[in-house]
Amino acid sequence: MLIYMESLRVFWGELGAFRYGVILLFVLTLTYIYHVIRRCVIVSRKVKPIDKQEHEGVSVIITSHNNAECLRRNLPSFLMQAYDNFEVIVVDECSEDDTQDVLIEIQKDYPQLRCTRIFPDTKFRFTKKLAVNIGVLAAKHDILLFSEINCRPSSMYWVKTMESYFDENTAAVVGFANYDFTEQNVRNLRMFRFLRFIKMMVMVKNKKYIFWDGCNMAYRKSYYIENRGFAKNSQSYLGYDNDMVRELSRFGAIKMTKDPSSYVIIDKSDKKGEIN
């Protein structure tokens, strides 16, 4: 033991000015380990849903542009939710494919499906925020639940689970969305979205609301109206989810859920959800 200590002392003396670099590296390593442990604690901490006697109505809002096949494949999963009081609103963003025919066909089997349309000749045809605004104004219920048509809920209890996190002090709830773990050719994208979700959870803990995920998020219509929607930046196509959650954080708590029943699965065949 003494020999070891003496060798260490000699080695430390020979480092000279480099010893300060070693100290700095040691401090940085400890700081990194601390942040890793802190993130793991935050991610593992459970946010429990609220035990409600009465559940609120929910309006699911989905926008779609030339996605007839995605509508046919994924829309039934949104419509078959095990929830008593909900509707699904599809806003057709200037589609020129078979979108309208597909919606009419599906609507025959699901009366809770409501549709509205932005016609192709409108000058706002590429504004996502306009489509979201139209869907919000058409909604009957105060809780608005958003996703993309290149996604599908992982369970029949998606609506119920997301709604269960709302109380009078909740402004928004954000859930997890990712590619199916059985798909092998989207591993990098799946890891990116997983790490992104962890980062969002850490930011929420620190009251920082920088980016969000329009594939799986919910907020109250009343707060949206009070905030005047996207009036501050209505013409930008991207960032509709980020802008809104930042604004809504002024009205109440922003919650994130890791409940498996709240997960949304993204189609590997359509990567457009990555821009949100």
Q: Which ranges hold each PLM region?
A:
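N-terminal membrane-anchoring/stem segments of glycan-assembly enzymes
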Residues: 1-53
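Acidic donor-binding/catalytic loop of UDP-sugar-dependent glycosyltransferases
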Residues: 98, 148-164
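Short, well-formed alpha-helical segments that are part of the catalytic scaffolds
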Residues: 43-45, 67-80
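Acidic donor-binding segment of Leloir-type glycosyltransferases
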Residues: 76-121
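Short aromatic/hydrophobic "clamp" motif used to bind/position activated sugar donors
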Residues: 144
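Glycine-rich, basic loop-to-helix element that forms the pyrophosphate-binding segment
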Residues: 119-139
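Catalytic donor/gating beta->alpha subdomain of glycosyltransferases that bind UDP-sugars
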Residues: 166, 172-195, 222-225, 229-276
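Cell-envelope/extracellular polymer assembly enzymes that use nucleotide-activated donors
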Residues: 56-59, 87
